[in-house]
A protein has these predicted regions:
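Thiol/disulfide oxidoreductase modules built on the thioredoxin-like
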Residues: 110-114, 122-169
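Structural microenvironment flanking redox-active thiols in thiol-disulfide oxidoreductases
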Residues: 74-113, 123-129
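Short pre-active-site segment immediately N-terminal to redox-active cysteine/selenocysteine motifs
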Residues: 59-61, 65-69, 101, 138
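Conserved hydrophobic/aromatic "anchor" residues
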Residues: 41, 65-66, 108, 116
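Active-site acidic short loop of glycosyltransferases
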Residues: 57-59, 89, 115
Length: 180
Protein backbone atom coordinates (compact mmCIF):
# COMPACT_ATOMS: atom_id res chain seq x y z
CA UNK A 1 0.00 0.00 0.00
CA UNK A 2 1.48 3.37 -0.88
CA UNK A 3 2.06 6.03 1.79
CA UNK A 4 -0.72 8.31 0.51
CA UNK A 5 -3.40 5.70 1.07
CA UNK A 6 -1.96 4.79 4.45
CA UNK A 7 -2.08 8.44 5.50
CA UNK A 8 -5.71 8.74 4.39
CA UNK A 9 -6.70 5.58 6.30
CA UNK A 10 -4.97 6.79 9.47
CA UNK A 11 -6.64 10.20 9.15
CA UNK A 12 -10.07 8.61 8.72
CA UNK A 13 -9.49 6.32 11.70
CA UNK A 14 -8.42 9.29 13.82
CA UNK A 15 -11.47 11.29 12.79
CA UNK A 16 -13.72 8.35 13.61
CA UNK A 17 -12.10 7.94 17.02
CA UNK A 18 -12.61 11.64 17.70
CA UNK A 19 -16.26 11.48 16.73
CA UNK A 20 -16.86 8.41 18.89
CA UNK A 21 -14.88 9.67 21.85
CA UNK A 22 -16.82 12.93 22.10
CA UNK A 23 -20.00 10.94 22.65
CA UNK A 24 -18.46 9.23 25.67
CA UNK A 25 -16.46 12.10 27.15
CA UNK A 26 -18.95 14.87 27.87
CA UNK A 27 -17.71 18.21 29.14
CA UNK A 28 -19.41 19.57 32.22
CA UNK A 29 -20.32 23.26 32.47
CA UNK A 30 -18.45 23.35 35.80
CA UNK A 31 -15.21 22.39 34.04
CA UNK A 32 -14.96 25.59 31.99
CA UNK A 33 -13.13 28.79 33.05
CA UNK A 34 -14.68 31.64 34.97
CA UNK A 35 -17.23 33.89 33.31
CA UNK A 36 -15.02 36.89 32.66
CA UNK A 37 -12.30 34.77 31.07
CA UNK A 38 -14.80 32.83 28.96
CA UNK A 39 -16.46 35.95 27.54
CA UNK A 40 -13.32 38.07 27.12
CA UNK A 41 -12.16 36.16 24.05
CA UNK A 42 -12.27 38.00 20.72
CA UNK A 43 -12.62 36.65 17.20
CA UNK A 44 -12.97 38.50 13.90
CA UNK A 45 -16.36 38.92 12.32
CA UNK A 46 -16.80 38.39 8.60
CA UNK A 47 -15.75 41.98 7.87
CA UNK A 48 -12.53 41.55 9.86
CA UNK A 49 -13.67 43.53 12.92
CA UNK A 50 -12.61 42.06 16.28
CA UNK A 51 -15.60 41.22 18.50
CA UNK A 52 -15.66 39.91 22.06
CA UNK A 53 -18.25 37.39 23.23
CA UNK A 54 -18.90 39.75 26.15
CA UNK A 55 -20.71 41.98 23.63
CA UNK A 56 -23.73 39.69 24.04
CA UNK A 57 -23.69 39.49 27.85
CA UNK A 58 -27.19 39.98 29.25
CA UNK A 59 -28.71 37.53 26.79
CA UNK A 60 -28.88 33.75 26.89
CA UNK A 61 -25.87 33.28 24.64
CA UNK A 62 -25.38 30.19 22.49
CA UNK A 63 -21.85 30.01 21.06
CA UNK A 64 -21.64 27.31 18.40
CA UNK A 65 -18.23 26.23 17.07
CA UNK A 66 -18.43 24.74 13.59
CA UNK A 67 -16.70 24.44 10.23
CA UNK A 68 -17.83 24.50 6.62
CA UNK A 69 -16.26 21.03 6.12
CA UNK A 70 -18.09 19.43 9.10
CA UNK A 71 -21.31 17.59 8.06
CA UNK A 72 -22.88 17.45 11.57
CA UNK A 73 -22.17 21.18 11.94
CA UNK A 74 -23.94 21.99 8.70
CA UNK A 75 -26.86 19.78 9.66
CA UNK A 76 -27.57 21.67 12.92
CA UNK A 77 -27.31 25.22 11.53
CA UNK A 78 -30.87 25.36 10.07
CA UNK A 79 -32.26 24.50 13.53
CA UNK A 80 -30.17 27.29 15.05
CA UNK A 81 -31.44 29.75 12.42
CA UNK A 82 -35.00 28.75 13.38
CA UNK A 83 -34.32 29.04 17.12
CA UNK A 84 -32.70 32.47 16.65
CA UNK A 85 -35.77 33.62 14.73
CA UNK A 86 -38.21 32.31 17.35
CA UNK A 87 -36.29 32.83 20.61
CA UNK A 88 -34.21 35.89 19.71
CA UNK A 89 -37.04 38.28 20.66
CA UNK A 90 -37.22 36.53 24.05
CA UNK A 91 -33.52 37.10 24.77
CA UNK A 92 -31.56 34.29 23.09
CA UNK A 93 -28.56 35.18 20.96
CA UNK A 94 -26.79 32.61 18.80
CA UNK A 95 -23.22 33.36 17.71
CA UNK A 96 -21.44 31.03 15.32
CA UNK A 97 -17.67 30.70 15.55
CA UNK A 98 -16.26 29.00 12.47
CA UNK A 99 -12.97 27.15 12.37
CA UNK A 100 -12.35 28.40 8.83
CA UNK A 101 -11.16 31.42 6.90
CA UNK A 102 -13.52 34.41 6.64
CA UNK A 103 -14.06 34.13 2.87
CA UNK A 104 -15.33 30.53 3.01
CA UNK A 105 -17.55 31.31 5.97
CA UNK A 106 -18.99 34.48 4.43
CA UNK A 107 -20.06 32.55 1.32
CA UNK A 108 -21.71 29.84 3.44
CA UNK A 109 -23.52 32.38 5.65
CA UNK A 110 -24.80 34.24 2.60
CA UNK A 111 -25.93 31.08 0.78
CA UNK A 112 -27.72 29.67 3.85
CA UNK A 113 -29.32 32.88 5.19
CA UNK A 114 -27.73 32.57 8.64
CA UNK A 115 -29.54 35.16 10.79
CA UNK A 116 -27.08 35.49 13.67
CA UNK A 117 -23.54 36.86 14.00
CA UNK A 118 -20.78 34.60 12.73
CA UNK A 119 -17.15 34.99 13.71
CA UNK A 120 -14.20 33.13 12.21
CA UNK A 121 -10.71 32.05 13.06
CA UNK A 122 -8.43 29.10 12.93
CA UNK A 123 -5.73 28.41 15.54
CA UNK A 124 -7.25 30.94 17.96
CA UNK A 125 -10.64 29.20 17.75
CA UNK A 126 -9.08 25.77 18.31
CA UNK A 127 -7.16 27.06 21.36
CA UNK A 128 -10.30 28.61 22.87
CA UNK A 129 -12.32 25.42 22.37
CA UNK A 130 -9.58 23.49 24.17
CA UNK A 131 -9.58 26.01 27.05
CA UNK A 132 -13.34 25.55 27.29
CA UNK A 133 -13.01 21.80 27.76
CA UNK A 134 -13.07 20.47 24.20
CA UNK A 135 -9.70 18.77 24.55
CA UNK A 136 -10.13 16.56 21.48
CA UNK A 137 -11.22 19.36 19.14
CA UNK A 138 -14.54 17.72 18.24
CA UNK A 139 -16.97 19.70 16.10
CA UNK A 140 -19.61 20.87 16.48
CA UNK A 141 -19.09 22.18 20.01
CA UNK A 142 -21.60 24.47 21.70
CA UNK A 143 -21.49 26.57 24.87
CA UNK A 144 -24.59 28.12 26.46
CA UNK A 145 -24.15 31.10 28.79
CA UNK A 146 -26.90 32.49 31.01
CA UNK A 147 -27.69 36.21 31.13
CA UNK A 148 -25.05 36.68 33.84
CA UNK A 149 -22.39 35.18 31.56
CA UNK A 150 -22.04 31.86 33.40
CA UNK A 151 -21.64 28.70 31.33
CA UNK A 152 -24.78 26.65 31.94
CA UNK A 153 -24.50 23.99 29.26
CA UNK A 154 -21.77 22.44 27.12
CA UNK A 155 -22.64 20.22 24.17
CA UNK A 156 -20.24 18.22 22.01
CA UNK A 157 -21.56 16.87 18.73
CA UNK A 158 -24.64 17.66 16.71
CA UNK A 159 -27.38 19.40 18.69
CA UNK A 160 -30.95 19.16 17.44
CA UNK A 161 -33.43 22.01 17.65
CA UNK A 162 -35.63 20.28 20.27
CA UNK A 163 -32.58 19.41 22.42
CA UNK A 164 -31.34 23.00 22.27
CA UNK A 165 -34.77 24.45 22.98
CA UNK A 166 -35.10 22.20 26.05
CA UNK A 167 -31.94 23.81 27.45
CA UNK A 168 -32.73 27.39 26.39
CA UNK A 169 -36.34 27.73 27.55
CA UNK A 170 -35.58 27.20 31.28
CA UNK A 171 -32.71 29.71 31.06
CA UNK A 172 -35.08 32.26 29.52
CA UNK A 173 -37.63 31.58 32.27
CA UNK A 174 -34.97 32.02 34.93
CA UNK A 175 -33.80 35.26 33.28
CA UNK A 176 -37.32 36.71 33.15
CA UNK A 177 -37.99 35.79 36.80
CA UNK A 178 -34.73 37.55 37.84
CA UNK A 179 -35.74 40.62 35.83
CA UNK A 180 -39.06 40.97 37.68
Amino acid sequence: MNRGWLFILVAIAGLGAGVLSHRYAPVSAEAVPSTDDALAVKFDDLEGKSRALSEWRGKVLVVNFWATWCPPCLKEIPAFVDLQRRLGPEGVQFVGVALDGREEVAAFVRDHAVNYPVLAGEEDVARYMQQMGNTIGALPFTLVFDTQGKVRHVHQGEWTGPEAEAVLKPLLSRASSHAN
